Design a protein with these regions (language model features):
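Nucleotide/phosphate-binding catalytic cleft detector across ATP-hydrolyzing
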Residues: 1-22, 28-149, 159-315, 323-397
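Conserved Rossmann-like nucleotide-cofactor binding loop
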Residues: 23, 154
Length: 397
């Protein structure tokens, strides 16, 4: 998928942000003035091998030239292609670096900000799956305090920022799963069996088959709210991505066939699955909200805070600033292809009433006034980490 300005200027070098995931490769391109001109997302089944990534990188390096600098973040190091996450980080960077040639490559390294390729040894653990922190750092430059909610195809990130700096409870994936800042649920790739072992539908509580028969993409396709081009991987059965095929897959999860009930019944079932997923996200959002309301300021050297305001200066941040007052409503910066679930939480009263939602893609005036393309802003929100690392690197210069 690609969303770009009508006439990108290929005579001046670009800043390119990369988010190398386990299932998708996302890219954001800024022009010489730091304005966003393109956001692209490609399916990349990294668990199948690095040969899924290398040709794609070569294509994009040739497509977007000249390039002034690369900003790289990732989460793909966790796929089971690699023996461990450290090996994954090393393999991905060893794949990327030769293709970049002489163009500078800066890698996002958590609280260290950006590090060049020759300074990365020993920092692999901080590079691993730090893409969410880049998104939060960019959001924190726009608001003194708030919450980032990024609902993606596979996972959901929920974390707060205060005093213009992210203040995560945890950093690594294992700890983030405990803190609920990482919720392993998304709107296309999550197997329905991961949402519940039993569900209540049509007056009966019934078991759910522990089989990869259907995913959340089927639920939102049945409900008619799955964004265009959101589902870039094969369906659970390798079949068609039609509404009828999704109904059949969803029915199979509870031992039924799609022809056994009418359309309204299947919509009801899809809404059951949606409610279960929203409840998971809502619980995490509530917990992180309480963290924000009770958190000390990030500059107080709280052991769980990452003082990124010192790495990426912001007009709001100051090492001597007083603790921020949590004004209401709280900015809720929404990102990811599943932003429609966040809006659903707001509209259906299942979320606290003291939030105001802000689309990630409009932050920082990255889109030129002459290019106010809502589709570009949409894709900037979908691919938040790629946009964030590009913007952070450009503005740090």
């Amino acid at each position: 998928m690609q969303r770009s300005s009508p006439q990108p200027d290929f005579s001046s070098p670009f800043t390119v942000g990369w988010d190398i995931g386990g299932a998708h490769l996302k890219i954001a391109v800024l022009d010489q003035n730091g304005k966003l001109i393109v956001v692209e997302q490609y399916p990349c089944a990294l668990w199948k091998g690095l040969d899924q990534l290398t040709p794609l990188l070569k294509h994009l390096f040739n497509k977007w030239t000249p390039i002034a600098q690369h900003a790289v973040t990732m989460s793909g190091e966790m796929v089971d292609l690699f023996t461990d996450r450290i090996a994954g980080v090393q393999a991905l960077l060893h794949t990327f670096a030769p293709l970049a040639g002489e163009v500078p490559v800066q890698v996002f390294c958590a609280n260290h900000g950006f590090l060049s390729l020759n300074a990365l040894e020993g920092h692999e653990a901080e590079i691993a799956s730090a893409n969410w922190l880049a998104s939060a750092a960019w959001a924190a430059q726009q608001f003194e305090h708030g919450i980032l909610l990024d609902i993606g195809s596979t996972t959901t990130d929920v974390l707060c920022f205060d005093s213009s700096s992210p203040i995560p409870i945890a950093i690594g994936d294992a700890d983030r799963l405990i803190s609920e800042e990482l919720v392993y649920t998304g709107v296309t790739r999550t197997p329905l069996m991961a949402l519940a072992q039993r569900i209540t539908w049509r007056g009966a509580t019934r078991g759910v088959m522990a089989e990869l028969f259907a995913t959340t993409a089927d639920v939102y396709r049945v409900l008619g709210i799955l964004p265009e081009d959101a589902d870039q991987h094969d369906a659970a059965d390798g079949g068609k991505k039609t509404r009828a095929a999704s109904i059949a897959r969803m029915a199979r999860m509870i031992g039924l066939d799609g022809h056994e009930y009418d359309d309204a019944a299947w919509v009801d079932l899809a809404e059951v699955w949606q409610a279960l997923q929203q409840a998971q996200i809502q619980a995490a959002l509530h917990r992180v909200q309480q963290r924000l309301l009770t958190a000390p300021p990030a500059f107080d050297n709280d052991s769980s805070a990452y003082p990124l305001h010192s790495v990426f200066p912001s007009k709001q941040a100051s090492a001597s600033a007083p603790p921020s007052k949590k004004s209401r409503p709280i900015p809720l910066v929404i990102a990811g292809v599943g932003r429609f679930l966040a809006r659903g939480l707001m509209h259906h009263g299942s979320a606290p009433t003291d939030f105001i939602t802000v689309e990630f893609g409009v932050l920082g005036n990255l889109i030129h006034p002459d290019n106010q393309n809502p589709v570009l802003a949409d894709y900037a929100s979908r691919c938040a980490p790629a946009v964030a690392v590009a913007a952070l690197l450009f503005r740090a210069q």
